[in-house]
Regions:
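Extracellular/lumen-exposed scaffold segments
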Residues: 1-163
Length: 163
């Protein structure tokens, strides 16, 4: 056994753990900032989607932001007569969280009765209640079209660590 303080340089086991935890928290913050960043849509990439976790007194909500290139639209609801794909949001939470229904803004009628679209930027909210911590993932899917063509269906998954 060696006598001496545990905190000698090179023996700072507690500090190393704190540094690892700090690095993990910093990495989570960078990931959250990247997920929240909005990329400007272009003709070749007409829809960009970003998401961020917004905490509140009951738990929080995922705020999903869609930005659309001028002239394109995405579908909110699709009539059985139309072949399009509507916006989907699939959220996975750990047991103990209570997942609310996604809150969409009003969409405008388009073509066939029963089909509605968004043709400008919009935000969807997904409320989640619970005081627990843990991972939450949210997969967002959509199809965009302009007056000449439709893009293949697309999706993106966002992951958050709730603390």
């Amino acid at each position: 056994m060696i006598d001496g303080p545990v905190s000698l340089p090179g023996n700072d086991y507690y500090g190393a753990k704190s540094k690892r935890e700090a690095a993990a928290i910093a990495a989570e913050k960078v990931l959250a900032e990247q997920q929240a960043r909005t990329v400007v849509p272009t003709y070749n990439n007409p829809v960009t989607v970003s998401a961020r976790w917004v905490p509140d007194e009951k738990g929080g909500q995922i705020e999903i932001r869609f930005e659309l290139f001028k002239g394109f639209h995405v579908y909110r609801e699709v009539s059985e007569k139309d072949p399009y794909i509507s916006v989907t949001i699939d959220t996975e939470v750990l047991q103990g969280f209570q997942l609310g229904s996604a809150i969409f803004p009003p969409a405008r009628p388009f073509g066939t009765p029963g089909t509605t679209v968004y043709d400008d930027a919009f935000t969807v909210l997904v409320p989640i209640e619970g005081k627990l911590s843990g991972p939450v993932s949210c997969t967002v899917g959509w199809q965009s079209c302009d007056d000449k063509m439709c893009t293949p269906p697309q999706s993106v998954t966002f992951r958050f660590m709730i603390r």
